[in-house]
Amino acid sequence: MSAKRVASRVPSSTPFTAEAATGPRLSLEFFPPRRTEGDGASGGIDGVVMRLRDLNPSFCSCTYGAGGSTRDGTRETVRRLIELGFNAVPHLSIGTDSEADIGALLDHYRELGVRRIVALRGDVPSGVGRARLVHNAETLVRWIRAHSGDHFEIEVAAYPETHPDARSPAEDLDFFARKVAAGATGAITQYFYNVDAYVDFVDRCRRAGITVPIVPGIMPITNLDGIVRFSENCGADLPRWIRKQLEALRDDEPGLRAFGIEVVTRVCQELLAAGAPGLHFYTLNRWGATAAICRNLGLNSAAA
């Protein structure tokens, strides 16, 4: 599939903020470091983010563990990102948190100068069945808007290959539409390697009247077992030809890394040619592959 053919199929999106109209947006995702060194829970993040500083990301987001398990680490990492000069964007997941808990976190982030939130249902905490999660991301978006008005831009998740819990693509699209109706101003997708899936998803969204920017999530490939495990857990399709080549390179670490960078670079090139409003990299707190892919794309700086 050529980039030219993809580009001809993508409907234009309607930007909700000035940044969406200035060019492709580059953003990076990190998680709170599991080890501490130097500055408390945030100590391990400095080296990674500073290696990626020259990419001039529009923002750096920080994940929030299942059931709020990394709440303190997320707050510390967000604070450290701000100290290092980055536009920090915390994830919030509703899990088993109360509306009051969420409100307190929103107040904390507002005091830090945060202007954007990634609002998610989040992973189901260990020992908590899905039936006990009476709230979802739509509820969280409504809580954020009720508590903070229009102070925050709100990003939500989107699933070009359909959320694994959804009974059908139509049901999943309805879930997404309800999050947008509740007040979301943009979306970041689950990662994928099939550009057609993204193109078709955006087309269905536009035909359904959903006009927020939908930024594709990008997962670099650096390890066979890791990408297979991630893909199985989140319902992302790892195309057979990619998996076959990764298996052939299992014992050739440099070759596997080079192949992964080449494949993901190609996916990103096709997405940008197709009119994707940006790229959001799931760095897994590693800088090498993300830096190499962005270098291949000529993304030495991103839209501010």
Q: What do these predicted regions represent?
A:
Residues F16, D39-A41, G68-R80, S98-L105, ...:
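Active-site-adjacent beta->alpha loops and helix N-cap segments on the catalytic face
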Residues E29, C60, Y109, K179, ...:
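Conserved, mostly hydrophobic/aromatic
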Residues C60-T70, L92-G95, V118-L120, T185-N194, ...:
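Catalytic beta/alpha-barrel core
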Residues E37-L52, T74, E99-D107, S168-R178, ...:
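Short, acidic/polar
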Residues S2-F59:
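Conserved N-terminal beta1-alpha1 strand-loop-helix module at the mouth
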Residues T17-A21, V49-N56, R75-G85, L106-V114, ...:
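Acidic (Asp/Glu)-rich catalytic clusters
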Residues R25-G44, A66-G67, A88-A100, E153-E171, ...:
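Active-site mouth loops of central-metabolism enzymes
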Residues K4, R9-E19, R132-Y159, D165, ...:
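Active-site pocket-lining/capping segments in soluble small-molecule metabolic enzymes
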